[in-house]
Amino acid sequence: MKALIIGGGVGGLATALTLHVHGIDAEIFEQSPEVKELGVGINTLPHAIKELAELGLLEELQRVGIQTSELTYANRFGQTIWQEPRGLAAGYDYPQFSIHRGKLQTVLHDAVVARMGPVVRTGHRFTRFEQTPDSVTAYFDKDGGEVSAAGDLLIGADGINSTLRAIFFPGEGPPLWDGVVQWRGALIKKPWKTGTEMMVAGPRNRKFIYYPISDDVAEPGKQLVNWTVTIKLAEFGTDMQSSADWSRIGDRELLHKYLQEADFQLGEFDPKSIVDATDQIFEYPRCDRDPLPYWSQGRVTLLGDAAHAMYPVGSNGASQAILDARCLADCLSGSNPVPGAIAAYEDARRPPTTEIVHQNRRSGPEQVIDLVEERAPDGFEHLSDVASDEELRSIIKGYSTMAGFGKDQVNK
């Protein structure tokens, strides 16, 4: 059996590796002329790390990432709303990693090349497909000419702007912007606390996020730290003024203006100083897509952001793509014919990812911040006067269970 995979990102590479474990050949087609380390920091949750560990990648992840030990949600005054251990520190069998997206992609890409050979085809822009009862053929633009490849199934792991998804749903249009713009960057700093903690602070429409993503830096005693500022500028559904990509250079002066208006008071964390100390910042709209009524047609299916693009709250984007990869490989390794296996994969993965998309639109676990802001916009003297531990816990634990990374779910 041979799978054709559109897209050489986290989802596509993880899929190729997982299929390889199950004895299924794969070929990856990436439209970029070369594989480059794009993006800044992301978090990968224990249920996804469990899958990567089973692929033998844990040691490499430990080398390039940070094992997150604690997560704090705070208001804009830096008052703690919720704090909890994460990953191994919380009793999981597998860690949670904060890691540069490009470094994660490189770990996966290097493993693909080492185990499967030169199966990543760069400079191939997917354009269309044809399928018969027995096979599928994908067509690509390569250096201005059309080339094709045949296989037993075609997997669209080509991101939020998926060409394959657009073929399935030609009237869907561009991604949906919720009116939030995100500015992101990374810089070298001394560790905060033990150098393994993550913080999300601010009110509903203005947040500051901070976490380390690597100890592998030239300056002893320092780390590479990722930061994100999110500001709501418009209402949901407003037309975007920029594309939903990873490489748009941010407007530093505009961000300064919004930070002044946001008035974060976070003690040792001064977002403006952190922004000023960052060499390059990126800016992009926060987007998702509406859940689909189906992902598949016969021998062809979608995976990752192409299937279920979601807001980056709750650390679930890349994690869910990795779970997709495992589920699809498991289904294909059974006795079902390929179309039946693909249908089983969709039946297993579409409902939970649909729910995550909806939950992330409601702020996911960050609802604890929103709840406290509604009740105490000017801060609080005692958190218990604003929200009970039980109320906050139900939000946090409800989200982790819904998204499949409750401790009992992962450790079973």
Residue ranges and their predicted role:
Residues 1-412:
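FAD-dependent flavoprotein oxygenase/oxidase catalytic domain
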